[in-house]
Each structure stands twice: as C-alpha cells, then as structure tokens.
From Swiss-Prot:
Keyword Lyase: yes
Keyword Signal appears in the UniProt entry: no
Protein species of origin: Geobacillus kaustophilus (strain HTA426)
EC number(s) recorded for this UniProt protein: 4.2.1.10
Name assigned to this protein: 3-dehydroquinate dehydratase
Keywords associated with the record: Amino-acid biosynthesis, Aromatic amino acid biosynthesis, Lyase, Schiff base
Alphabetized Gene3D superfamilies for the sequence: Aldolase class I
Primary role: Involved in the third step of the chorismate pathway, which leads to the biosynthesis of aromatic amino acids. Catalyzes the cis-dehydration of 3-dehydroquinate (DHQ) and introduces the first double bond of the aromatic ring to yield 3-dehydroshikimate.
GO biological process entries: 3,4-dihydroxybenzoate biosynthetic process; amino acid biosynthetic process; aromatic amino acid family biosynthetic process; chorismate biosynthetic process
Pathway: Metabolic intermediate biosynthesis; chorismate biosynthesis; chorismate from D-erythrose 4-phosphate and phosphoenolpyruvate: step 3/7
Reaction(s) the record says it catalyses: 3-dehydroquinate = 3-dehydroshikimate + H2O
Similarity field: Belongs to the type-I 3-dehydroquinase family.
Binding residue positions for 3-dehydroquinate: E50, W51, R52, R86, R216, S235, Q239
Amino acid sequence: MNISPKAIKVRNIWIGGTEPCICAPVVGEDDRKVLREAEEVCRKQPDLLEWRADFFRAIDDQERVLATANGLRNIAGEIPILFTIRSEREGGQPIPLNEAEVRRLIEAICRSGAIDLVDYELAYGERIADVRRMTEECSVWLVVSRHYFDGTPRKETLLADMRQAERYGADIAKVAVMPKSPEDVLVLLQATEEARRELAIPLITMAMGGLGAITRLAGWLFGSAVTFAVGNQSSAPGQIPIDDVRTVLSILQTYSR
C-alpha cells in the first residue's frame, strides 16, 4: 500500500493514507450507556471511535470521566479513540465547565493513556498551544477543528481555518459547515481539494445535513481523510449509518481507481 508522507499512523490505522477512515461517535449520557453503546458500535468495526464527552452528564466529575475512558479503552481494543468536548457555540451540548476546566480535563484524559486523539477547537486561539504541549508530552494526536452550524463561509475562510490549524500545531485539521445550497457543498469540496495540495497534515471536512451527505460519502476523493458515520446514535446532522457508508465507499473505491 502506498502511504502519503502526510499520513499519520494511530495504532493500526493510517489517517490521511490512501483509504478513507470511518469514525463512529459514542454519545451516551452516563457511564453505563457510553460503554453499552461502545460495545454495539465496535461490533460494526469502525476505524475510529469518537467519545463525545459533552453528552456525558458527569463531565464535571473527573474521576468518573477517567473511569469511563478506561472502560472505553478496554472495549475498543486497538480501535483508536478520539476524545471530544464540543462547545455549545459549535454545536455541542451545554456543560458546567469553563475553558480552563476543559483544558484540565483534557490534560487528565491525555495522561490517562486511554485515548489516542483529542479534538480542540480553533476558536480557542492561542490557548491551543497549551493543549499542543500536553498532547505532545502524552503522545496523543491533536485535531484542531472549526464548525459552522449557521451556514458555509467563503472558500478563502475555510482555507484560512485549515492553515491556521496547521500553524497552531494540529496533527489533523477539521472543518465542518452547514450548507444552504448545492453551491455551498461545492465550496467545501473546493476548499478541501486546495488544502489537500497545500497543507502538510491530513484533513477532515464535511458538509452537514442532507445536502452535505455526498461529502460524507465522497469527501475522501477531494482530500478528507475521515468520515463520521452512525454506529448507534448520531452526533451531528446528516450522519449516515456505518454499514451504508461502508457500502458506498467500497463501490466508489472500486470504480475510481
């Protein structure tokens, strides 16, 4: 298999290689539901798991978060785990933690050894440097993300976001938009294709909702390394069941070579 020089290896999978990866979210509200959902999702063999910890009601109880993360690790085995606390401003659930407390929790979860990647939002700006240092210390990969739930900005804005993520030290840059027209979907795909040629890190991009479904199925042809698919419960508008995504990816891979 030919591996792109910008691809990264996380456990046994390559992100940004020649094959698109499927990531399935886990969104349980308590430890029992998180672990049960993870068991169901892992039976479908995604390439990655994302724990959306902003759905976790006890997120302000660090001991319970760490115990749940360790339980997830035991269930996932060698499937890489992405830890995400999505802010309310970018489509996440309201949580009782301020930014400093979120960073402290991220540090604890990185040091636990239970996770492989962590998502941190581009909007945090210079504070990304603190998270970058701790992820490097803990050998955890950093995804720097930006989500536009109210529309789709200009291509130049999306490119600037991905460039900025790389400048802040991201291992992976992620951008998601909410299209209002087919033209918006094309803007996202054009930005992805241009960023793929320019940046030295893997990308994750998607257009959400029904209009954006094509980007979840064919975005990898334009440079998006990971698509998010429903394993049990959706974490964002427009996510498609993992079995359907796998079927379409297989067809596209067969006929696009």
